[in-house]
Amino acid sequence: MPTAIKLVLDAAGPNTIVASPTGCLEVTSTPFPESSWRVPWIHSLFENAAAVASGVEVALKRFKRTDTNVLVIGGDGSTFDIGFGAISGMFDRGHRITYVCYDNEAYMNTGVQRSASTPFCAKTTTTPTGKMSLGNPRPKKDMAAIAVAHGVPYVATASIAYPVDLRRKVKMSLSADGPAYIQ
């Protein structure tokens, strides 16, 4: 399990349910028939982890299970691109879910293709650099600002270089009155 995910789960505690879309994290943490996850974990489609987590959160509310944390942990491809609509809906509906984006700035699992998280002028296999190209022609999408624009109560950026800060931000996100976003 990657260090960042260990830190997030350590902060969230054992009473946590995680939904993760297809992507680098899912491929490396669940080689059939095994799993690295030590909490209830749901593998969703690439585009709908936020919708799956929304259903989990509604079911927990229905059964008055307010002590269970619901997380989505997804990469930048599912967050910035393919699952963007479901995330927007989750934010808009106010589900009490912490969405953690594991941002490596490209579709790494399938060959380092550009995503909306890839920085301006960065080299990827689909945005090469050279005489005819400076690399990625688009600026990186500002997902934190988009979350703020949705009125998300808790939005933060973090780095595994600062583990104490990451843990603190996860704990704060779990006490938010509504959705939270950490990148």
Please report, for each region that a protein language model flagged, where it lies by residue.
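Cofactor-binding active-site loop characterized by glycine-rich and histidine/acidic residues
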Residues: 1-102, 112, 117-122, 136
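Glycine-rich ThDP/TPP pyrophosphate-binding loop and its adjacent helix/strand module
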Residues: 66-70, 81-97, 102-183
